[in-house]
Amino acid sequence: MENKEQNNTDQLQTGDLNKARKLHKCYLWLFVVSLIIWLGFISLFFLYYLPISLVIALVVIAFIFVLVFLGFLETWRKNINQEEEFLRLEGLLITSPTDTQSAIHKDNQ
């Protein structure tokens, strides 16, 4: 009996991975919007008070941060996909009622 309860707690619903994907998209959009606001602030404020070469340097630094952050998000997305594939192969991911039946059948064996 305890074994069945343990297997049920180990199984993940696809909703958990969908939440991770939605969170990934939310962070991406939040980053893009904040970047646009930040670059707008730089262009309006610093252009009047700083030399153009310094403004260009700040934009290049911001672009490097964009690339690093997008690389982080891409790595996160790949990890989510790898986790989903691993769980599907192990039979721990329930995606449909037939998967539930096969998981129950696997537990009974």
From Swiss-Prot:
GO cellular component: plasma membrane
Keyword vocabulary terms for this entry: Cell membrane, Membrane, Transmembrane, Transmembrane helix
Domain of life per record: Bacteria
Transmembrane segments: 28-48, 52-72
Membrane topology annotation: Multi-pass membrane protein
Compartment annotation: Cell membrane
This protein's name: Uncharacterized protein MPN_579
